[in-house]
C-alpha cells in the first residue's frame, strides 16, 4: 500500500477519492482490526482522534484503539439529553480505560435551544437534521479543528444499518482520513471481544436497547423492528456525524 497524500485527495471529487483509495481498502479488508489501527498509525498523518457516542458496544473500539495508541483524544459530542445510564457509563469507561476524554457541546445550551426553536426532534426530518447539525455536526467539526485531527477512528459496523452496509475501512470525511477498524465485525465478534477483555455492554442493553442516543429519540427494540427503527422515530439512522 502506497503512502496517501491527504491534501491531494481532498482536491479530488468524492467519486475520484473513493477510486484513489480502492486499492488501499482492498488490502485493509485483509487485515484484522488491530492490524488496521496499526497500519493507520504507521501510514496516515496525525494528529489522531477517536470518536465515541458511548453507546451499546462502545467499549470495544475504545479499548481496541486506546490499547494500541494510549492517550488518543476521545471525542464525545454531548447533547445534554443522553440517558443517565450513558453519563455513568462514560465515567466508568473513562476511569477503567484511562481515556483522554474530550467533550464538545453546542454553543447554545439545551434549554436555550428549546426556548429558541422548540423541540426540534418533534419537527420531522428537517427538525431532526437541524438538531443534529447544532448538537452533533458543529461540535464535531470544532473538535476536529481544535485537536488538529488528520486521522479519525470510529467504531461503525456494516451490520448496524443499511446506511452503513457498504462503508469502506478507509475514507475521507470532513477533510480528514476516517478509519473504521471494526467495520466488518458481527454481533458475535463484538460479544467475544467484550468477554475476552472483561468489558461490558452499555447498561441499557439488558433493558432491550440495541442502540442508544438521546432520551427523546431512542426506543427499545421490539419484535419485528429493524435496529435503525429504534432511533429518530425510524425517520433516519444517522445523527449526522457519519454522513457526508
UniProtKB/Swiss-Prot annotation:
EC number: 1.8.4.8
Keywords attached to this entry: Cytoplasm, Oxidoreductase
Record gene name: cysH
Family recorded in the similarity comment: Belongs to the PAPS reductase family. CysH subfamily.
Cellular localization per UniProt: Cytoplasm
A GO cellular-component term linked to this record: cytoplasm
Pathway: Sulfur metabolism; hydrogen sulfide biosynthesis; sulfite from sulfate: step 3/3
Keyword Disulfide bond in record: no
Reaction equations catalysed: [thioredoxin]-disulfide + sulfite + adenosine 3',5'-bisphosphate + 2 H(+) = [thioredoxin]-dithiol + 3'-phosphoadenylyl sulfate
Lineage of the organism: Bacteria, Pseudomonadati, Pseudomonadota, Gammaproteobacteria, Enterobacterales
Protein name: Phosphoadenosine 5'-phosphosulfate reductase
MF-aspect GO terms: phosphoadenylyl-sulfate reductase (thioredoxin) activity
Domain of life where this protein originates: Bacteria
GO biological process, one term: hydrogen sulfide biosynthetic process
Active-site residues per Swiss-Prot or TrEMBL entry: 239 (nucleophile)
Major localization listed first in the record, in broad terms: cytoplasm
Transmembrane stretches, start-end: none
Broad class of enzyme this protein falls into: oxidoreductase
Known function: Catalyzes the formation of sulfite from phosphoadenosine 5'-phosphosulfate (PAPS) using thioredoxin as an electron donor.
Organism field: Shigella flexneri
CDD domains cross-referenced by the UniProt entry: PAPS_reductase
Amino acid at each position: 500500500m502506497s503512502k496517501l497524500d491527504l491534501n491531494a485527495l481532498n482536491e479530488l471529487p468524492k467519486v475520484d477519492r473513493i477510486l484513489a483509495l480502492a486499492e488501499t481498502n482492498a488490502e485493509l479488508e485483509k487485515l484484522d482490526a488491530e492490524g488496521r489501527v496499526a497500519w493507520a498509525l504507521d501510514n496516515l498523518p496525525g494528529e489522531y482522534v477517536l470518536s465515541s457516542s458511548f453507546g451499546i458496544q462502545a467499549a470495544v473500539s475504545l479499548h481496541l484503539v486506546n490499547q494500541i495508541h494510549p492517550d488518543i483524544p476521545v471525542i464525545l459530542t454531548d447533547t445534554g439529553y443522553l440517558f443517565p445510564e450513558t453519563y455513568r457509563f462514560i465515567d466508568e469507561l473513562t476511569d477503567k480505560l484511562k481515556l483522554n476524554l474530550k467533550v464538545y457541546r453546542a454553543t447554545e445550551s439545551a434549554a436555550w435551544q428549546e426556548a429558541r426553536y422548540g423541540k426540534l426532534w418533534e419537527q420531522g426530518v428537517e427538525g431532526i437534521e437541524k438538531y443534529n447539525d447544532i448538537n452533533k455536526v458543529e461540535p464535531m467539526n470544532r473538535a476536529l479543528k481544535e485537536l488538529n485531527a488528520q486521522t479519525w477512528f470510529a467504531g461503525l459496523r456494516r451490520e448496524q444499518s443499511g446506511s452503513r452496509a457498504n462503508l469502506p475501512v478507509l475514507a475521507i470525511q470532513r477533510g480528514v482520513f476516517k478509519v473504521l477498524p471494526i467495520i466488518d465485525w458481527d454481533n458475535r465478534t463484538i460479544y467475544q471481544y467484550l468477554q475476552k477483555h472483561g468489558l461490558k455492554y452499555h447498561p441499557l442493553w439488558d433493558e432491550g436497547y440495541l442502540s442508544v442516543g438521546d432520551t427523546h429519540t431512542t426506543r427499545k427494540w421490539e419484535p419485528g423492528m429493524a435496529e435503525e427503527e429504534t432511533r429518530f422515530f425510524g425517520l433516519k439512522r444517522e445523527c449526522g456525524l457519519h454522513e457526508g
